From Swiss-Prot:
Residues 56-65, 143-157, 203-215, 270-332 are cytoplasmic. This is 30 kDa heat shock protein. GO terms for cellular component: endoplasmic reticulum; plasma membrane. Signal peptide: none annotated. Present with 7800 molecules/cell in log phase SD medium. Keywords: Membrane, Phosphoprotein, Stress response, Transmembrane, Transmembrane helix. Probably cooperates with other heat shock proteins in the translocation of polypeptides through membranes. It may counteract the altering effect of heat shock on the plasma membrane. It is found in: Membrane. It comes from Saccharomyces cerevisiae (strain ATCC 204508 / S288c) (Baker's yeast). It comes from the Eukaryota. Residues 1-34, 87-121, 179-181, 237-248 are extracellular. Belongs to the archaeal/bacterial/fungal opsin family. PANTHER family: 30 KDA HEAT SHOCK PROTEIN-RELATED, PTHR28286. Its main location: membrane.
């Protein structure tokens, strides 16, 4: 059994076919082996989603199909990204700011050395996070205690969450491509954006949708894991404290937790306990203001004096105006 596993791992020729060049610090075969393992996990989950998709088309509810779509997309994006990552593709070389990670023999002669930066993982996060945020919103809206959901509030909150999350992903990407200390400016901006975004998520989930129980625990765990991405970035692309292999293991574990385990849980929760809420444009969680009770003042109108009723066939007789009577007397 061990010989078979060893033989299988020895078939990994990614670094031989796509060798890192012009780099002092890059992933090794051990790092690539780990990335292929994560790739296989996402591939297995992807196949499960494909089978579930065909089952849901025939026997599943609409909510199951709605939840299955973002979960499938997340897994597909990560499957694609880890194939690229494990194949030693989708990277560029950037000189490190600090000389914490050293090599016995420098290839480039630069001090600090040139570090391998995988921009492909940022692209995968950019594509996956909006789908995950939509799935979180869907699960909270369909499994919570609220039966009436404001569509405008939902779109407003979800838009802020998506834009804020994409902003911190782009901030970390730009910061990783800068060799000077200015990279930490982008890191700080991204961290502030993530803090504001998580504030919006908490307000929406815990106060508006009233997410409780194990769903709330899973959401809080996911929000804590997000900050581990920033810690990993500071140790790898930012601070050059850990080797690229350690970075690959760190990010691989985080991605498995956020983009593999959590979407599976949300999909199961929606399929088991979800119910379609009523959507309205004004209902739900709109705040009450005192001015809402003040009705617009209606313009004053002069009441019309009703004409006296007359019998059928009776000719209406109009009395002459006083001015007309005076004119007739003067003429006489």
């Amino acid at each position: 059994m061990n010989d078979t596993l060893s033989s299988f791992l020895n078939r990994n020729e990614a670094l031989g076919l796509n060798p890192p060049h012009g780099l002092d610090m890059h992933i090794t075969k051990r790092g690539s082996d780990w990335l292929w393992a994560v790739f296989a996990v996402f591939g297995f989950i992807l196949l499960c989603y494909v089978v579930m998709f065909f089952i849901a088309e025939n026997k599943g509810s609409r909510l199951t199909r709605y939840a299955l779509a973002p979960a499938f997309l997340i897994t597909f994006f990560e499957f694609f990204a880890f194939f690229t990552y494990a194949s030693d593709l989708g990277w560029t070389g950037v000189q490190a700011e600090f000389n914490h990670v050293k090599v016995s023999k420098s290839i480039t002669g630069e001090v600090p050395g040139i570090r391998q930066i995988f921009y492909s993982k940022y692209i995968a996060w950019f594509l996956s996070w909006p789908c995950l945020l939509f799935l979180i919103e869907l699960a909270a809206s369909t499994t919570g205690e609220n039966d009436d959901i404001s569509a405008l509030d939902m779109v407003h909150s979800l838009l802020i969450q998506i834009v804020g999350t994409l902003f911190w992903v782009v901030s970390l990407l730009v910061g990783s491509l800068i060799k000077s200390t200015y990279k930490w400016g982008y890191y700080t901006i991204g961290a502030v954006a993530m803090l504001v975004t998580q504030g919006v998520i908490c307000q929406r989930q815990f106060f508006n949708l009233k997410t409780r129980g194990f769903n709330a625990l899973m959401l809080c765990t996911c929000m804590v894991i997000v900050w581990l991405y920033f810690i990993c970035w500071g140790l790898s692309d930012g601070g050059n404290r850990i080797q690229p292999d350690g970075e690959a293991i760190f990010y691989g574990v985080l991605d498995l937790c956020v983009f593999a385990i959590y979407p599976c849980y949300l999909l199961i929760a929606v399929s088991r306990d979800g119910k379609l809420p009523r959507l309205s444009l004004t209902g739900g969680f709109s705040h009450h203001h005192a001015t809402d009770d003040v009705e617009d003042a209606a313009p004053e109108t002069k009441e019309a004096v009703p004409e006296s009723p007359r019998a059928s066939g009776e000719t209406a007789i109009h009395e002459p105006e006083p001015e007309a009577e005076q004119a007739v007397e003067d003429t006489a």
